[in-house]
Amino acid sequence: MKLEIHKQLEEKMNGTIDALKFEFGTIRAGRANAQMLDKIRVDYYGTPTPINQIGAISVPEPRILMISPWDKSAMHEIEKAIANSDLGLNPSNDGEVIRLSVPALTEERRKELAKKASKAAEEFKVRIRNERRDANEKIKKMEKGGELTEDELKKAQDEVQKMTDKFIKEIDTLLSKKEKDIMEV
């Protein structure tokens, strides 16, 4: 029995998983990845702007990120934003492009990043559980309003729980992949 609530819940939970994937993309592992820069905002003519909106980001080598700003006057601001970020990257500017060398992670930094990934996963599990609670409340209101019988209520709640379990398991899988990626030397 698929109710409209179940479809909406699945969409919300898929959105939560997508947000977690984005979050994990911003946590750097030992390799260069253009997503690492997604959270950095550059003061571009007084407006906080994502780097990917003021320049092209490429990965020419496994440990090198290259930013080619479309407006060369923004280079200094891009460098400043990267240097002030918590990524631990040192930008070098040759007048045309900004190169970022992604250093190998120390064991301590790896553990720190794994902890950060674990914390993010836990926050997203809470979001999934909150979505479950909201869906169950809607289902109970439908039963009180006479739209569902008691048996249908139980089936609908069981379906919500199955979906919740599936998405929590997916978060655990994503976390273990990310931790493996981070801890890889």
From Swiss-Prot:
Keywords: Cytoplasm, Protein biosynthesis. Its main location: cytoplasm. CDD domains: RRF. InterPro entries: Ribosome_recyc_fac, Ribosome_recyc_fac_dom, RRF_sf. GO terms for biological process: translational termination. The keyword Transcription does not apply. One of its GO terms (molecular function) is ribosomal large subunit binding. GO terms for cellular component: cytoplasm. It is found in: Cytoplasm. Pfam families: RRF. NCBIfam families: frr. HAMAP family: RRF. Responsible for the release of ribosomes from messenger RNA at the termination of protein biosynthesis. May increase the efficiency of translation by recycling ribosomes from one round of translation to another. Belongs to the RRF family. This is Ribosome-recycling factor. It comes from Clostridioides difficile (strain 630). The lineage of its organism: Bacteria, Bacillati, Bacillota, Clostridia, Peptostreptococcales. The gene is frr.
